[in-house]
């Protein structure tokens, strides 16, 4: 329900008995949207703090990575846990990326999360959809690892570009 109000309509609504009944659903909808936004923002901030803690620790703290990987693993198992057969990269990889995009937008983070998820599902290969999910993650990592290393190389070695050739 969308209600557009201006000064004249607010004045006329306030004088009518419909004001409360008209504004009440809109107010509750706005409250719900605000609560959802605050929850998602706090979850994003929490994940960001955890990522900073993970990268600040030397060597990287695998307990923090496990906390970050758990909701992604659950989402991937919910989405791909019952699939059987072979992976169709043109269909399945974009779906995998859309699930990953919900949690993070950085390829380097995807790499760490996918490796952690893959490590967690390897011993339990007896479940129905796990070989499929394992193959799907491997295919994504075959794309993600080289592209991340190229970006990393460009970022760390850009001052050494040979311009003579």
UniProtKB/Swiss-Prot annotation:
It comes from the Bacteria. Disruption phenotype: Mutants lacking this gene are defective for virulence in a mouse model of septicemic plague. One of its GO terms (biological process) is protein secretion by the type III secretion system. The core domain is composed of five alpha-helices that display structural similarity with one domain of YopN/SctW, a central regulator of type III secretion in Y.pestis. NCBIfam families: type_III_yopR. The gene is yscH. May be involved in the regulation of the assembly of the type III secretion system (T3SS), also called injectisome, which is used to inject bacterial effector proteins into eukaryotic host cells. May control the secretion and/or polymerization of YscF/SctF, the principal component of the needle filament, thereby impacting the assembly of the T3SS. Involved in pathogenesis. One of its GO terms (cellular component) is extracellular region. The keyword Cell inner membrane does not apply. This is Type 3 secretion system regulator YopR. It is found in: Secreted. It comes from Yersinia pestis.
């Amino acid at each position: 329900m969308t209600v557009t109000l201006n000064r004249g309509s607010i004045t006329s609504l306030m004088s009518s008995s419909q004001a409360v009944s008209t504004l009440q659903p809109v107010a509750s909808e706005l409250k719900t949207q605000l609560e959802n936004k605050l929850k998602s923002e706090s979850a994003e901030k929490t994940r960001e703090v955890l990522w900073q803690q993970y990268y600040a620790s030397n060597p990287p703290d695998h307990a923090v990575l496990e906390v970050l990987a758990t909701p992604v693993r659950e989402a991937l198992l919910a989405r791909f846990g019952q699939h059987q057969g072979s992976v169709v990269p043109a269909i399945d990889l974009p779906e995998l990326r859309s699930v990953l995009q919900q949690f993070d937008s950085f390829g380097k983070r995807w790499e760490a999360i996918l490796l952690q998820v893959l490590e967690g599902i390897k011993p339990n290969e007896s479940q129905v959809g796990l070989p499929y999910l394992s193959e799907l993650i491997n295919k994504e990592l075959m794309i993600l690892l080289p592209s991340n290393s190229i970006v990393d190389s460009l970022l760390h070695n850009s001052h050494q570009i040979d311009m003579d050739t």
